[in-house]
Amino acid sequence: MYIRKKILFIFILLFSFTVFTQDIEEIIVKGEYREKSIIEEDSSILIIQSDKIKSQAIKHFQQLSYLVPNLNYAASDSRARYFQIRGIGERSGYQGTPNSSVGFLIDDIDYSGQGGIATLFDVDQVEVFRGPQGSRTGANALAGLIYIKTKDPTDKFEGTSELTFGDYGTQNIGVAFGGPLNNEKMKYRLVMRTDYADGFRKNIYLNKSDTSKKDELTLRYKLDWEIDETTNINFLVSKVDMDDPADIWTIDGSLNTLSDRPGMDSQITDSIGIKIKKNFNNFDLQSLTSSTKTDVVFSYDADWGNSDSHFPYTYDYFSETLRKRDTFSQEIRFLSKNKDFSQSNPLEWVFGFDFSELDESNLTKDDGVYGDPSDPFGPYVSESSISRNYKSENLSLFGNIDYFLTNKTKLAFGLRLENWDSKYKDSNNESFSPSDNMSGGKISLVKKTNNDSNIYFSIARGYKQGGFNLGLDATDNLVRQSLIYDPEYLTNYEFGISLSLIHI
């Protein structure tokens, strides 16, 4: 694991070190507009490569998060979907706008707010950017960005497999293989992975030991096609199916549950991504297109018990939320060639535009009954349901210029302008249509002191789109407008030193 810790300078200067040997190969940051050495990075970043992931026997990103300083996650009964960096981020997503403070990208596909799919089999490396990434990602990265890069197809055929058995019915089976096709201009990689475990809890009322199980499937197929010397197409399709029942809450704090209606915390996500790269004489063109479809079931036994455990009272409540989320994104980038001092070209630039849309629907149903044997008017039955629909569109223009004062000193400017439009409506007749224009950016100065260390200063501004407050049954337009809140902004001042000493 290579840790590059950046130092926030307020009144006291704190030193931290990137550690690896001089003989190790160069570490490349892959989550930026263009790949670059970690020594050129101007923000607080931590990179965990595949060898470290394998050595830790880590199956999911939420387990990996224990190795990342300043990163926390929030989970209900199953996998973590929400993350916080430096204390900023969501802990749940029951209602309102599904805005994320921490961006979550896998192979350049945005899964922000859907982190449950982050299984780590056949992953190349994980990058965690701490601090606002307003110029790089936009509204979903107020606090930072998590970028996961899976392994790409290789020029020669290769494969890997994993088989694990353990306590509590644990079974992990994974296989990944690929290489060139008959036409050497095409190469592929196929990944299949299943993870199963009964869980640590036993439902003694139903006499079952798998009501908190993990039953997860990961499928991924990558195809790289080199059409000619200047054109390359990368195709990706993936499916993650997480069938994870939710039965962990206990009345007495033990590992034995008493629920008579165990819930579910499942997620199925289908994704497709197409990346086109075209090289011209003076610049490169990149097109990134992606689409995701997600179905989530989140339910739980709200009384944690059964008719026997609550006797002589009648106490039985259950809640279920069915969520569907569809996303689409199209990004176009124009990138300059690398700097060339021999040609009096000290600039590297990128500019482009990004369009994304999100369509999410939620159906929440709650039912329950309560009865007291001493109450002549009981029992009391309650039933409620609400459907919510939210749509949003984001259009942004972005650019970044790296001006190399010398071969070791770089001044960088980044800017993103973003327009956001949204519509919300629910079955309680609440409706909102907030919109806004937002901007973020970054300016930094980086100086390499030698081949494996640098010093930098940066000012970064991130943003997060606004939203609205629910539950007031507002039908008057004037009242509704008063319930809409503005976007959030975060400005980060950072002074950092990176030193490379030893390898862990």
Write out the residue ranges for each language-model feature.
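Extracytoplasmic beta-strand/coil segments of soluble accessory domains associated
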Residues: 62, 66-107
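N-terminal periplasmic "start-of-domain" segments of outer-membrane beta-barrel proteins
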Residues: 26-54, 81-84, 102
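Surface-exposed extracellular loop regions of Gram-negative outer-membrane beta-barrel proteins
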Residues: 183-202, 216-218, 247, 284-327, ...
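N-terminal periplasmic accessory domains that precede
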Residues: 27, 62-64, 82-84, 128, ...
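Flexible loop and strand-edge segments within Gram-negative outer membrane beta-barrel domains
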Residues: 232, 236-269, 309, 314-315, ...
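Short acidic/polar hinge/loop motifs at secondary-structure boundaries
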Residues: 93-94, 101-132
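Transmembrane beta-barrel wall of Gram-negative outer-membrane proteins
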Residues: 158-160, 165-197, 201-244, 268-270, ...
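Structural signature of Gram-negative outer-membrane beta-barrels, strongest in the C-terminal barrel
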Residues: 224-230, 238, 334-337, 346-348, ...
